[in-house]
């Protein structure tokens, strides 16, 4: 059963998100006044939320492989304004949300049940042009000529596992803006805030990427596991085996 104060908590989360991200959809330069303090308050509220508070029961693992007609990920819409969206993503066992970006957006992710592994990356700003791999650099698997022209430098900043006991994972327009989310050892779900929401007509479309690994000389110092480390990113279409469908949200309603 939800705690007695949870209806007010999810309402307070939405209200605090409104304060934190006010003006984020208007194209105004920089965050609103008091943004760091408001963001800290929002993180504190998100840290408290649990699956039972939203009337969401942890899902059981389904037999593998998943039937092809079942979406690997579903989404429960809770609330949305021009400034932010609030909802829950549910990942089936063994699935992931592929590496993708959030152009000009902030994001906050709080695990409700299960464990997710989040890999956070950024594209490296190279000014007016872009840096290409040197001609002698080889990749595994090899890149086609057009792919070689299209790859961009990036940085893999972190890779960590989050559970319901973890605080929220936060991304900004300039830090950890690309991420991949994998369900680890079973199904998982997380509460998600995006500010402002995706809007292709306003330049906030979702782009997918894959990491292409250079072949490293055996004598090269350091390990591929050392983070942060430079990577190469190739924009790709949405994977055929990934899609997301909606399902009803069973928890307390959020009012304007």
Swiss-Prot record:
Catalyses which reaction(s): cysteamine + O2 = hypotaurine + H(+); N-terminal L-cysteinyl-[protein] + O2 = N-terminal S-hydroxy-S-oxy-L-cysteinyl-[protein] + H(+)
Binding site for Fe cation: 100, 102, 179
Cofactor: Fe cation
Superkingdom per UniProt: Eukaryota
Keyword tags: Dioxygenase, Iron, Metal-binding, Oxidoreductase
InterPro entries cross-referenced by the UniProt entry: PCO/ADO (IPR012864), RmlC-like_jellyroll (IPR014710), RmlC_Cupin_sf (IPR011051)
Described function: Plays a vital role in regulating thiol metabolism and preserving oxygen homeostasis by oxidizing the sulfur of cysteamine and N-terminal cysteine-containing proteins to their corresponding sulfinic acids using O2 as a cosubstrate. Catalyzes the oxidation of cysteamine (2-aminoethanethiol) to hypotaurine. Catalyzes the oxidation of the regulator of G-protein signaling 5 (RGS5). Also oxidizes proteins RGS4 and interleukin-32 (IL32).
Protein name (record): 2-aminoethanethiol dioxygenase
Gene that encodes the chain: Ado
